[in-house]
């Protein structure tokens, strides 16, 4: 059935899909008809253990019963009002309580919208135009931050300048991730409005910040009066209720959010200092609006998700799943291909890089053996485990990845590693 769907889809969609990474499964993507817990159920009557989880939002797993119940209750009350609703206040209160930087919040509809708005705020706040980003960091599909972005361009060899005006390109400066000295040099020599960073890179595989890297960014931006923006679309509420900023004890001026705070429904948010967020209309003169901003259905799903995170041991279960899997995987790979791989991980996020011993930035990640990763992916998929088809995405676990799921995964991993 998936092949049939693919052939039909190719008539209607560019490349047959509506987001390019979905086409990375070869020879054609499989089509999912339903999902529950840690499992996907395909149109080809296959059950797959899912370690993609919608590329990050589903920290509770698929169709969590409590979230589902709350969504259905809200559907019965209506799902779009065009007015404020009490539920948006409740979700904002939760985020503000847990996230160190979140004095005030503006909800939007995607991570892309959130980073667009964060740049607009940084420029308005400082009166400057130039933004520093990092090679391989992905901040959404808009013109200002596509340069040297992550997985999509590395995987599909896209010319990132296609359709982007040179005037926009000229406002962006790029440093290598973990290179704070580059940031300081640019901050000294140019009028920098802000620095935007994934505190943990999640769209180039998983790449962790070096010791003191985030602290140095905070020091530099304070010294030169520029705005520090953490893009926590992936890490927000995944590394813990306080996100990466809570984990690393570094508080940015602005934080962009998405994924988990919408409970699997479309969402984005910019959170940060009161004096910056209050520049937004109608309080200030920086424009933002959206028909679906803070729509009650998404607010309900996000609030329900955070309520589960607060009262149950979600992070403990998801993190334990990674630790158990990696213990087995490292041992198996050490025997099969010693000194020829590295696994980066934090919390419930990890990625395997073959053919290299260290990955601390995008340049090093690109040296990994993509063909071996693709073989690893294909072998796992054939045996019923779905990890990202791209080397430069993140493998996620969830609250649904309990012992029975993990044990099945371990059995499959042992067989797959022997076939590499």
From Swiss-Prot:
Belongs to the class-III pyridoxal-phosphate-dependent aminotransferase family. HemL subfamily. The keyword Cytoplasm applies. The modification N6-(pyridoxal phosphate)lysine is found at residue 259. Pathway: Porphyrin-containing compound metabolism; protoporphyrin-IX biosynthesis; 5-aminolevulinate from L-glutamyl-tRNA(Glu): step 2/2. This is Glutamate-1-semialdehyde 2,1-aminomutase. One of its GO terms (molecular function) is transaminase activity. It comes from Sulfolobus acidocaldarius (strain ATCC 33909 / DSM 639 / JCM 8929 / NBRC 15157 / NCIMB 11770). PANTHER family: GLUTAMATE-1-SEMIALDEHYDE 2,1-AMINOMUTASE (PTHR43713), GLUTAMATE-1-SEMIALDEHYDE 2,1-AMINOMUTASE 1, CHLOROPLASTIC-RELATED (PTHR43713:SF3). One of its GO terms (cellular component) is cytoplasm. PROSITE patterns: AA_TRANSFER_CLASS_3. Coiled coil: none annotated. Its main location: cytoplasm. Signal peptide: none annotated.
């Amino acid at each position: 059935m998936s092949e049939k769907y693919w052939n039909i889809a190719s008539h209607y969609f560019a490349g047959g899909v509506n987001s390019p990474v979905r086409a990375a499964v070869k020879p054609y993507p499989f089509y999912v008809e339903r999902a529950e817990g840690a499992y996907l159920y395909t149109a080809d009557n296959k059950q797959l253990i899912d370690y993609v989880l919608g590329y990050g939002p589903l920290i509770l797993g698929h169709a969590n019963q409590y979230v589902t119940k709350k969504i259905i209750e809200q559907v019965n009350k209506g799902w779009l009002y065009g007015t404020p609703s009490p539920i948006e206040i409740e979700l904002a209160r939760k985020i503000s309580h847990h996230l160190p930087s979140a004095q005030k919040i503006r909800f939007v509809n995607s991570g892309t919208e959130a980073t667009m708005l964060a740049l607009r705020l940084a420029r308005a706040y400082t009166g400057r135009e130039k933004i520093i980003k990092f090679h391989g960091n992905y901040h959404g599909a808009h013109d200002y931050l596509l340069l040297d972005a992550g997985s999509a361009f590395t995987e599909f060899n896209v010319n990132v300048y296609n359709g982007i005006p040179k005037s926009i390109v000229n406002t962006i400066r790029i440093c290598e991730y973990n290179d704070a000295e580059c940031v300081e040099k640019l901050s000294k020599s140019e009028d920098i409005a802000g620095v935007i960073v994934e505190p943990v890179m999640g769209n180039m595989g998983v790449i962790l910040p070096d010791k003191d890297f985030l602290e140095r960014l905070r020091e530099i931006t304070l010294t030169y009066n520029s705005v520090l923006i953490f893009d926590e679309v992936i890490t927000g509420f995944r590394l813990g209720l306080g996100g990466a900023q809570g984990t690393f004890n570094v508080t940015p001026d602005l934080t962009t959010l998405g994924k988990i705070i919408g409970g699997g429904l479309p969402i984005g948010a910019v959170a940060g200092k009161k004096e910056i967020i209050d520049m937004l209309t109608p309080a200030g003169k920086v424009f933002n609006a959206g028909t679906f901003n803070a729509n009650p259905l998404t607010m309900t799903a996000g609030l329900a998700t955070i309520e589960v995170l607060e009262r149950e041991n979600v992070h403990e279960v998801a993190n334990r799943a990674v630790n158990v899997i990696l213990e087995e995987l490292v041992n198996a790979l050490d025997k099969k291909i010693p000194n020829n791989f590295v696994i980066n991980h934090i919390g419930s996020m990890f990625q395997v890089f073959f053919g290299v011993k260290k990955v601390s930035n995008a340049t090093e990640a690109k040296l990994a053996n993509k063909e071996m990763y693709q073989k690893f992916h294909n072998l796992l998929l054939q045996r019923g485990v779905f990890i990202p088809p791209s080397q430069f995405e993140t493998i996620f676990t969830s609250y649904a990845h309990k012992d029975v799921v993990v044990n099945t995964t371990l059995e499959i991993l042992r067989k797959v590693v022997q076939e590499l």
